[in-house]
Amino acid sequence: MRALPVVDADPRERKFVKLGRLAQLAGVLPSTIRHYMRLGLIGADAQTPGGYGLFDPERALPRLRRIQDLQSQRFRLIEIASILVGENGVGAA
């Protein structure tokens, strides 16, 4: 697991959003994103001093949309993980 930068400033002053806001923007439940995180499909970009994950919506939203698109094509999440690795050349980033 990679070390995440800690963001001391108020996340509203930065481009980062918390998981709940990312879920709202993506139109999914926070538990869906947590599940994707457990599977390595998506990861936080930074964290608060308290350890909460922060996400760059410019990076995370396209990835969530890609996951949703692949699911609509009937791919299983394990298959989606392989596809994303192949597309990006890396894991969940």
Predicted feature residues:
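Short coil turns linking two alpha-helices in DNA-binding domains
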Residues: L29-T32, R38
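Arg/Lys-rich, alpha-helical DNA-contact motif
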Residues: M1-L25, R38-L39, G43-P49, L54-A93
